[in-house]
């Protein structure tokens, strides 16, 4: 029979109606001769009642055979429950079953189909189709669908045009590693899966599309963590003739629409703006979490005269004050934080506690002469814990920024119901790579430099500033964008500053440079990480929880066993050979 409605949508207004439902057996209970079944579908759970006095012996026998995750079809009359269940939207009603058909049976599942399970991640991914039956996973993906629907409606209203760009593209330097796809037709040549549609969307501006968007898959072969995947989805925008402020206004409107339509939250516009240098100086991060205080304090000048060379001779000395936390952290706890500090390049972590108005701790004796100055500079009170890092400014900022976030989580200082958006602006154009031994693009090599610093492309690259902007939410980079270069000579200067010869630039980006000979308009855009945005809206800590079929931390899919080896014939068609590493040879 045709399904009448979703099980999770049956309500009191349906009492007395005969309906047909289809779904999965969530739970079966035998009570006083009656059989109760929780029928589950994507919209929720509906209680079924099978009464032996009101059904045939065949229906009763079928009901007794039911097990968890059997797929069934039931017909019956909706009735009011004697005792309502306030925890369920369907809790005021039940279905008195008159007909029951088993559509399919099921083996015992490797974990219960319910929220809050303790199965490990690889087991969940191995049986992802079962994991996705769990209500919280269904809700996460329904939220994702609502977010994308809201985004599309908003951008359509603003006359953005949805254009698909190629997945098989050209491998270019300056970024994460590419996923390469060998060409069978062009032996020895490779496509790359795009890390973003950056160049193609710029070319669409040259083509006159004016406002482009796409909700698009992107690919990066990089080390994974909780908020990264090898394939991810971004909301990609590009516009012509708009200023930085106008692009940010559009983005804020998009986010405000999504927040209102999916979470019922009215966000305050415009979002705060913070310069990159201020974010690093005060929060130790280019994606500051502004839901709590504990700002970084610069004590370099204050400690210059102390008889402690670690402080007095350091390029920078910075500190954070953990208010009232002196008793929360033992020496052993601080030793653990010291190990964290070393991961960020710090040589160590100095600390003092304020106890009865005096400084206590390993370095307290060196600070006695400046206790009054420290107390004033840091607004110290009894029971405060002060953590110091003496190192380069970059190391001090990064270390204390990381500890700031860690401590806030440990002490419960973060209001998880807050959504604090802000723009980080006025970025450096380049960042120094120790691994490469050279300056690299902080964003990408197509970013427009600020006019007043562009002359430093042939001078001190550290002084070049970009017309770039990142949108940050609760300590996560939600997205980023910039105005782009549209003048050929400036683009060539940018490539040269990055160490490209004219031949290398032409080989890698000749098609873009050629396009700049044909009236390339001023343009700029932005991309928002959809997975990360939905993760934060859903209150999750890992983007795997909002992606239907993600990879694990080894970039593998335990369900399909991808990536996998392929037949020798397929490799031969591609003129490829796989060399065994030493580990493979010994196993």
Swiss-Prot record:
It catalyses: tRNA(Asp) + L-aspartate + ATP = L-aspartyl-tRNA(Asp) + AMP + diphosphate. ATP binds at residues 220-222, 229, 477, 529-532. Its EC number is 6.1.1.12. L-aspartate binds at residues 174, 220, 443, 484. Residues 198-201 are annotated as: Aspartate. Keywords: Aminoacyl-tRNA synthetase, ATP-binding, Cytoplasm, Ligase, Nucleotide-binding, Protein biosynthesis. It is found in: Cytoplasm. Pfam families: GAD, tRNA-synt_2, tRNA_anti-codon. GO terms for biological process: aspartyl-tRNA aminoacylation. GO terms for molecular function: aspartate-tRNA ligase activity; ATP binding; catalytic activity, acting on a protein; nucleic acid binding; transferase activity. It comes from the Bacteria. One of its GO terms (cellular component) is cytoplasm. The keyword ATP-binding applies. Its main location: cytoplasm. Gene3D superfamilies: Bira Bifunctional Protein, Domain 2 (3.30.930.10), GAD-like domain (3.30.1360.30), Nucleic acid-binding proteins (2.40.50.140). The keyword Aminoacyl-tRNA synthetase applies. Homodimer. Catalyzes the attachment of L-aspartate to tRNA(Asp) in a two-step reaction: L-aspartate is first activated by ATP to form Asp-AMP and then transferred to the acceptor end of tRNA(Asp). Belongs to the class-II aminoacyl-tRNA synthetase family. Type 1 subfamily. This is Aspartate--tRNA ligase. The gene is aspS.
């Amino acid at each position: 029979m045709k399904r009448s409605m979703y099980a999770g949508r049956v309500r009191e207004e349906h009492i007395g109606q005969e309906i047909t439902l289809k779904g999965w057996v969530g739970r079966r209970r035998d009570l006083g001769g009656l059989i109760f079944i929780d029928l589950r579908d994507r919209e929720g759970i509906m209680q079924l009642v099978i009464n032996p006095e009101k059904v045939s012996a065949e229906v009763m026998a079928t009901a007794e055979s039911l097990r968890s995750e059997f797929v069934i079809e039931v017909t019956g009359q909706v009735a009011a429950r004697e005792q309502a269940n306030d925890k369920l939207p369907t809790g005021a009603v039940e279905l008195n079953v008159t007909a029951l058909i088993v559509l399919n049976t099921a083996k015992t599942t490797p974990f219960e189909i319910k929220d809050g399970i303790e199965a490990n991640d690889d087991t969940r991914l191995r049986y992802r189709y079962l994991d996705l039956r769990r209500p919280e996973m269904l809700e996460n993906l329904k939220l994702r669908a609502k977010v994308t629907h809201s985004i599309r409606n908003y951008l359509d209203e603003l006359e953005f045009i949805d254009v698909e760009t190629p997945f098989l593209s050209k491998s270019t330097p300056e970024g994460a590693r590419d996923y390469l796809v060998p060409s069978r037709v062009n032996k020895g040549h490779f496509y790359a899966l795009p890390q973003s549609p950056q160049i193609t969307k710029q070319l669409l501006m040259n083509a006159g599309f004016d406002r482009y968007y796409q909700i698009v898959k992107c690919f990066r072969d990089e080390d994974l963590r909780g908020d990264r995947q090898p394939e991810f989805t971004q909301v990609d925008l590009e516009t012509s003739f708009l200023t930085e402020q106008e692009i940010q206004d559009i983005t804020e409107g998009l986010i405000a629409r999504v927040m209102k339509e999916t979470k019922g939250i009215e966000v305050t516009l415009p979002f705060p703006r913070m310069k990159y240098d201020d974010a690093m100086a005060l929060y130790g991060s280019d994606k500051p979490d502004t839901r709590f205080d504990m700002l970084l304090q610069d004590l370099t000048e204050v400690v210059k005269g102390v008889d402690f060379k670690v402080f007095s001779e350091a390029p920078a000395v910075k500190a954070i004050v953990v208010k009232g936390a002196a008793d929360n952290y033992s020496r052993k706890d601080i030793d653990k934080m010291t190990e964290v500090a070393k991961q960020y390049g710090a040589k160590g972590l100095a600390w003092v506690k304020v106890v009865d108005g005096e400084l206590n701790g390993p370095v307290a004796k060196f600070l006695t002469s400046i206790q009054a100055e420290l107390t004033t500079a840091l607004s110290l009170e009894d029971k405060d814990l002060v953590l110091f890092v003496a190192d380069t400014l970059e190391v001090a900022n990064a270390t204390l920024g990381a500890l700031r976030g860690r401590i806030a989580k440990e002490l419960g200082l973060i209001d998880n119901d807050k959504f604090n958006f802000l723009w980080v602006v006025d970025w450096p154009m380049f960042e120094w790579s120790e691994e490469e031994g050279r300056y690299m693009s902080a964003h990408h090599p197509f970013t427009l430099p600020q006019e007043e610093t562009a002359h430093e492309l042939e001078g001190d690259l550290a002084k070049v500033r970009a017309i770039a902007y990142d949108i940050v939410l609760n300590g996560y980079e939600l997205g980023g964008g910039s105005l782009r270069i549209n003048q050929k000579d400036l683009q060539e200067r940018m490539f040269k500053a990055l160490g490209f010869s004219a031949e290398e630039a032409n080989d890698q980006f000749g098609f873009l440079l050629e396009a700049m000979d044909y009236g390339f308009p001023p343009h700029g855009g932005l991309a928002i990480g959809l997975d990360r945005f939905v993760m934060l809206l859903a209150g999750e800590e890992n983007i795997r929880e909002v992606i239907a079929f993600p990879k694990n931390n080894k970039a593998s899919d335990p369900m399909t066993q991808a990536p996998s080896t392929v037949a020798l014939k397929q490799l031969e068609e591609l003129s490829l050979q796989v060399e065994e590493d030493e580990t493979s040879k010994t196993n």
